[in-house]
Amino acid sequence: MSDEDSMLLNFTTNEDTAGSSYKQAAKVTGGRWKDRRRMKMKLEGKTVSRKRKANTTGDEGIIPGRGENSIKKLHKESSYSSEEQEKYKGRNAHNTQGRTLPADSQFVSSLFTSNREITTAVNTNIHDENVAINPSNAPLKGDQFASLGVSSLLVSHLEQKMRIKKPTSIQKQAIPQIIGNAGKNDFFIHAQTGSGKTLSYLLPIISTILNMDTHVDRTSGAFALVIAPTRELASQIYHVCSTLVSCCHYLVPCLLIGGERKKSEKARLRKGCNFIIGTPGRVLDHLQNTKVIKEQLSQSLRYIVLDEGDKLMELGFDETISEIIKIVHDIPINSEKFPKLPHKLVHMLCSATLTDGVNRLRNVALKDYKLISNGTKKDSDIVTVAPDQLLQRITIVPPKLRLVTLAATLNNITKDFIASGQQSKTLRTIVFVSCSDSVEFHYDAFSGSDGHHKNLTGDSVRLLTKGNTMFPCFSDSRDPDVVIYKLHGSLSQQMRTSTLQHFARDNEATKGKHLIMFCTDVASRGLDLPHVGSVIELDPPFAVEDHLHRVGRTARAGEKGESLLFLLPGEEEKYMDYIQPYHPMGWELLKFDKEILMPAFKDVNVNRNDKFIRKDEKSSKNKDVGDKEYEWDTNATTWHLNIERRVVGDSAFKNLAVKGFISHVRAYATHISQEKKFFNVKFLHLGHLAKSFGLRERPKAMGLQSSKDGNSEKKPTKENSKNKMFRMARMAEKQIASEFNY
């Protein structure tokens, strides 16, 4: 072998390069594509990133309203240079759909843009201020109760204790006819709200009893049965009756309403009573299950009064009323014991409006009746109208601006009250909304914003304290003198009663203060709340009859009053033509921006609630700093953003807002069929309406059903039969092996 044949070549190879080329040449087959991809990445020496790194730049995140479970793909970290990333962001900044945003970012829409155009430019039913107004429900000047046949004892009691000297128009017509009636006719009393219908039937009944020569006490039996649709109205009638009979202590009324202990009511019935006042359900319950009530009625019952008949039918009490009347008619009446009373039952039906339900109830309860009315006759029909001295106002507000416009309205009323200097009087305002959840939201929004409040009666009455910034007119140097109330049917009966009593009371606790009550229609019927200056209908009523009852809480018994109705642009504007016959004195059409928002938010400085404010800056609030003028629209936007930020940061308040919005939309869909052309849920812009509840997106888009807030729990999965069998077997084996099994 030659040297050339035995020559050796020595090459140095890189093991990493060789291994890499081998790995790259390897091909993974079989299995799922995810498994193949993981194996390929492992062969290539790459690690699988299971968790996404936190993004400190805030350029990427989770779309608000979409939970983490909804994100199914994770983007890989960008390998582009910083210049390329900025260029990409700028090119795609206009399109955020389908991309991730910061976790705490939300779309904040402007209050004053993208609103529906208001088409009503001219008021077709102008209120003429130069026309002399005579209050339509005021007491008559030239008449006296004594001339109507009222007992002299009652007349002196009315003048001295109750400060009532003159009868109203409906009282002048009803009292003589009821007193002079010997059981011949029934009566249908029809009169507008605030005209004194309660006294028009209580006074003649009590006068007839007092004019008897026979001795009467609480054991003489019940002379009258009064049925009211709501607990509040029944309680009010009871208190009026108690005040009237306080001049003759031997006459005793009894109240039967739901929410109270039946045992206590039975005890009062056993002691005896002369007037039974209650709600239909509880009265029927006692008639069916309490023996003593039939004994009370059989001795002396002569009068059956159905107050607020339209509401009785609206709430579905028609069958209950029919059952009560049937049971009462089956009770034999002894007419020999009190010969001066009517020889048969006298039925009375009272209503402020004439509806189909009232006509049905009239056919069931009344026979040979007389119609007593002070309504306006038109085309042979009786039309109920609002009181002449009522100043009706209407404003058309876009849905996004409802909340801030309500705040501006309440601010203007409070500011005018403070400027008037009437510290010895009490101003009352009632705000009607459609549902109880909406009441809860608005109550907490206006009373619990910054912690400057104090609970007075449970959690339904709050006094705003010094430092509160809810209204722009508030000053740090004095107390706001504003008390916020809430009232709806979901509250307990004790809380409803105590809230109404506190709102209606005139004492040192309410003297010189502005009392604002957020309520549903539970407070719209029959309640005689003293000195209610303004009524605000934030949500339109479900029927025009409810509108008359709402505005009837003010301008009562000849007093002046104001009412403001909120409407949305579009189809709701035609509602004004629908209610025009009920307002013969016309109304004022207010522009929400120039006549409500601007007076409230100009020349003030509304501060943000997410920044710390120094004392020197805080003291300059509500003062002109040099020649600086604050834009009213900027202040209004800041005020509304404060509410929105509170919704974002406070989960409990957010739940109130979401529930209030959902319940409001559901309630909006329950308008009667005749008014669907004005109030149709299809016409609503739900996104704009959600903003009026402080929500930046509709609740469904905010992941209401997800566990984003950590409050909702996952539903347990259903256990199949096999796992259940094994679990039961393990439990049996454990029980056998237990030391306590002997």
From Swiss-Prot:
Biological role: ATP-binding RNA helicase involved in the biogenesis of 60S ribosomal subunits and is required for the normal formation of 25S and 5.8S rRNAs.
Biased composition (Basic and acidic residues): 710-722
Chain's gene name: DBP7
Chief localization: nucleus
Name this polypeptide is given: ATP-dependent RNA helicase DBP7
Region (Disordered): 45-100, 701-726
Classification lineage: Eukaryota, Fungi, Dikarya, Ascomycota, Saccharomycotina
Phosphoprotein listed as a keyword: no
Organism of origin: Saccharomyces cerevisiae (strain ATCC 204508 / S288c)
Domain Helicase C-terminal positions: 405-605
Annotated ATP binding sites: A191, Q192, T193, G194, S195, G196, K197, T198
Record GO terms (molecular function): ATP binding; ATP hydrolysis activity; RNA binding; RNA helicase activity
Domain remarks in the Swiss-Prot or TrEMBL record: The Q motif is unique to and characteristic of the DEAD box family of RNA helicases and controls ATP binding and hydrolysis.
Localization per record: Nucleus, Nucleolus
